């Protein structure tokens, strides 16, 4: 995919969705033509992870039942299904996992999802499976060694074998915690994720990252443990507060910038429609975002290289979260983090002013913040937080930046002056170049 225009990238993803529009055909017919380098400088291959961006042809499959399906490739391929009222797909995920759930099914959920978990339990029992319901606290505080130990004890009491299966029903914290419990029980049993927030659907539940927090920081203890299946049941979003839904769009828009320009078009064209849980537009955005992530993690599960591009915007976002004591939602911080990264890239001569402005326009259309006034005068504090970022090497802040939409570059080390100018632009303490 390196060297493709954004239109060609979008066309390939449209083919994955089964589209056959004339514009799609024209873009695909031009694949042999090199991308225009106007406004950008040539990049060395080592700088970019763009070579894994495009999902395999037909990777996104639209069924007659209205569901969108996608296979995440890798050593242990698994299916992601997106749609509404997917209780039957939860059962299919379990019975299709190694062992088929014969060794028992641990259905782990947060208290607020008692009723929905009950529906999944009914379906699993109807399939002849032995089911144990386990409740865990919601939110980041659940990702602790104490809660994890409780899960181990309960898995032991139910005598779960290697032919058993764990089902996680909840947000990103729940899928992180339960995924790690599954990764460590008997050195690994299958897990099926049923994410119940938009953020979890497009981010935490797909990719195989699991873990808990410690006193030293977030997600410092964990494992890569790909799920046996991911079921994105959009019906659960009906009860999600609008602000939480919008926060999930932060990762969606990020995916648009790093790989799929069609996402940006949908967000800016239908800003009201994309926050309706039952809208086809939202279903498409979830599927497209998952396709972007799947294309990357299928080639780089353990974040050895190209997977870093999924961290676009996260260097500054994590600093924003820390500076606000995590009062900012992750997707909100990612939105500002992407604007910061665009400011950095523009000041380094990599990114046009138009694409910088597009960052503010797209995230604003999604109802997300594009500035961080609380950070004014706190540059040194945020830089210190950025030095704790996992991409740091030998003390140097390394970032994922864009040369254009769908043209990410990784492993870049901006100097302190550029970082300060970008920080001042997003905090309002200095001139912004994309207003």
Label each residue range with its predicted role:
Residues 2-43:
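C-terminal peripheral helix-coil segments that are non-catalytic and often amphipathic
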Residues 41, 65, 250-253, 350-435:
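C-terminal charged capping/lid subdomain of soluble metabolic enzymes
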Residues 49-165:
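ATP/NTP phosphate-donor binding region
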Residues 100, 159-161, 184-186, 212-214, ...:
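Solvent-exposed alpha-helices and their adjacent loops that cap or buttress functional pockets
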Residues 173-180, 201-202, 318-319:
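Short glycine/serine/threonine-rich phosphate/pyrophosphate-binding segments
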Residues 180-273:
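A glycine/threonine-rich phosphate-anchoring loop and its flanking beta-alpha core
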Residues 265-380:
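Active-site segments that bind and position negatively charged phosphate/pyrophosphate groups
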